[in-house]
Amino acid sequence: MQNYLVINTFVENSNENIRKFSKLAKLCRCSVIDCNFKVIGQSLSIILLFSGTWDAIAKMEDMLEKLEKEDDIVIQSKRTEIGKLQENCIPYAIDIVGPDQENLTFNIINFLLDGDLFIKRVSSSVSESSQTGIKMFTLHMIAHIPSNSSISTIRNEFTEFCDQFNLDAIMEPMK
């Protein structure tokens, strides 16, 4: 039987820290099921989902404790289960680009949740356009739409919503 452990930490951005956390699975004989490394400012955010036998996961937990003490960092970890597939949903990729505005991420997420979509992943950023210097907002999202929903209605309402904020958006089923 497989066991699962999710970890989350925020450390100094360095190749050594990336190597250290990447090496954990090998040392404990676990598999990496999901992996997210992201540089935020001068820091590195790490989220990993490991799977393994009960003794491999126990070894991982011990190594994480040791790593916390040696490197004086905080690592959140929790045993978890893999969620069941949402068979009654259609996965969609959503990409949005436009001028940055206050509360934009919240407004987009709130709109989609109000439409009964299930948000599975969100990544957004703001950067200065090299062409004009304006701050541009980008968002990538994976959402699941219940299969009994009217896709055309959701798409039309989403397009109207994005038009209100002068955002360019693409919403398409994942293959």
Region locations from a protein language model:
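Regulatory modules associated with amino-acid/nitrogen control
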Residues: 1-175
